[in-house]
């Protein structure tokens, strides 16, 4: 029923990913339904890293930062559990471990500074850990950025000046071997500050590089929140995986939003909370069926 209008009242909701096969299929769908809109949903908003890097460096197309912890001499983590809950943690563990081993080719260990609210795996491995409220991380980031040389930032009433000064001293000493990272729970402003420090220290192209963001195959109109705002103009919703009724923020009230759509089609592994409000549920092949 959506074909005559080019899919103007059709929306697709899917999980972020880097599958070239899926990207190819989505492009094929877009060619058949040029007016359809595509949205993504991930209960953990790891996309902040892409959005922040793209904004901080003024790139015309989305880019994602790749961190080289094996090359870093001094690391500052701003509420970033990079060897625990962050994206690419498996690679970060391997690279970070290389920098912590003392051998003939690496006579010095890397040094890790961590500002965080809750104890994390990364914090447990820190040489210098500062416990802070989540809301205060930006203040510490600004104080460090100002001392490193980023314009327009000062102390902002921080409590532990000595800790900050020692961190800044080591970051400046490391220069291009320094690396500042921000976690996915932190707002855009903290991520932009982290990238500003990396650029000021000369780390860009050394301990951090910018790569093209994962190709989703089609332009993305937004996240679940944007889809909620546009739901009045949607007659057909196609859900490719995910379980937003279960894991979306409660203030979105996604179960009620989904119930407003005339036709909901879902491809997923099992009949779960989101399946209850669907008109058609299609079984998704798991990895043993699709390899």
Q: PLM features: what roles do these ranges have?
A:
Residues 1-291:
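Cofactor-pocket helix-loop regions in the catalytic cores of large enzyme subunits
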């Amino acid at each position: 029923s959506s074909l005559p209008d080019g899919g103007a009242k059709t929306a697709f909701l899917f999980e972020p990913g880097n599958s070239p096969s899926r990207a190819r299929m989505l492009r094929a769908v877009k060619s058949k339904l040029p007016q359809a809109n595509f949205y993504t949903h991930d209960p953990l908003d790891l996309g902040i890293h892409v959005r922040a890097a793209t904004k901080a460096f003024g790139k015309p197309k989305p880019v994602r930062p790749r961190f080289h912890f094996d090359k870093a001499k001094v690391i500052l983590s701003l509420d970033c559990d990079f060897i625990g809950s962050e994206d690419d943690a498996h690679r970060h563990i391997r690279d970070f471990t290389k920098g912590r081993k003392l051998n003939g080719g690496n006579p010095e260990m890397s040094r890790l500074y961590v500002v965080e609210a809750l104890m994390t795996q990364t914090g447990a491995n820190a040489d210098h850990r500062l416990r802070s409220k989540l809301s205060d991380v930006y203040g510490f980031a600004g104080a460090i950025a100002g001392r490193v040389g980023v314009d327009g930032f000062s102390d902002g009433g921080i409590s532990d000046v000595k800790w900050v000064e020692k961190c800044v001293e080591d970051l400046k000493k490391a220069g291009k071997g320094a690396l500042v990272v921000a976690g996915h729970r932190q707002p855009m402003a903290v991520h932009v500050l982290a990238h500003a420090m990396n650029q000021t220290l000369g780390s860009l192209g050394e301990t951090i590089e910018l790569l093209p963001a994962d190709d989703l195959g089609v332009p993305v109109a937004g996240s679940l929140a944007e889809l909620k705002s546009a739901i009045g103009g949607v007659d057909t919703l196609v859900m490719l995986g995910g379980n937003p009724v279960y894991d979306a923020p409660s203030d979105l009230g996604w179960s009620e939003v989904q119930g407003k759509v005339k036709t909901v089609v879902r491809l997923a592994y099992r009949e779960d909370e989101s399946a209850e409000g669907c008109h058609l549920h299609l079984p998704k092949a798991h990895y043993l069926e699709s390899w």
